[in-house]
Curated annotation (Swiss-Prot):
MF terms in GO: ribosomal large subunit binding
Name of this chain's protein: Ribosome-recycling factor
Described purpose of this protein according to its UniProt entry: Responsible for the release of ribosomes from messenger RNA at the termination of protein biosynthesis. May increase the efficiency of translation by recycling ribosomes from one round of translation to another.
Gene name tied to this protein: frr
Region entry Disordered, spans: 135-164
InterPro entries assigned: Ribosome_recyc_fac, Ribosome_recyc_fac_dom, RRF_sf
Family per record: Belongs to the RRF family.
Organism: Sinorhizobium medicae (strain WSM419)
One Pfam family linked to the record: RRF
Keyword terms of this UniProt record: Cytoplasm, Protein biosynthesis
Length: 186
């Protein structure tokens, strides 16, 4: 008899959704400086678009300041332009091969907008988790229909898949609440 559904594989896929969510919310700017803020920035370099961290070193020298050290002097202008055009509301100050980026205080409107974006990311992750759950439930129904597992085993595994889904979604909610608190903190 087959086991019906690979719970480890479902857990791995659900954990992937959590990892993607953590990465998404890490790029949201809060009151404190973080190199992750510049993750979405891509630079036109050497004939293609590259992530900023592949053409420069990003550090956090102060609580409200980022420092970007561009490796190739000819790329400084492109890096500055990419940061300005990134819709992050940042204005880099060029200092030789370095760019200093002061992070402005977030106003209430911008904070609420960031919280909304965080909620969108959370919803996207929850949908991904529910798709994984649906795939698992479909596999269980097929295994039961094909006679690979009995009705009782199918029901038991179905409950395990549901519990796993509930746990992952509550973890996403917890991460969202933490990020929301961090964003709204003045």
């Amino acid at each position: 008899m087959s086991e019906g559904v690979d719970l480890k594989e479902l857990k791995r896929r659900m954990d992937g959704a959590i990892s993607a969510f953590k990465h998404d919310i890490a790029s949201l700017r809060t009151g404190r400086a973080s190199a992750n803020v510049l993750d979405p920035v891509t630079v036109e370099a050497y004939g293609s678009r590259m992530p900023l961290n592949q053409v420069a070193n990003i550090t956090v020298p102060e609580a409200r300041m980022l420092s970007v050290s561009v490796w190739d002097k000819s790329m400084v202008g492109a890096v500055e332009r990419a940061i300005r055009e990134s819709n992050l509301g940042l204005n880099p100050i060029v200092d030789g091969q370095n760019l200093r980026i002061p992070l402005p205080e977030l106003n209430e409107e911008r904070r609420k907008s960031l919280v909304k974006v965080a909620h969108d990311y959370a919803e996207k992750s929850k949908v991904a988790v529910r798709h994984v759950r649906r795939d698992g439930m479909d596999d269980l129904k097929k295994a039961e229909k094909d006679g690979e597992i009995g009705q009782d085993e199918s029901r038991a595994q179905s409950e395990r898949v549901q519990k796993m889904t509930d746990d992952v979604i509550s973890e996403i909610d917890r991460l969202l609440a933490d990020k929301e608190k961090e964003i709204m903190q003045v």
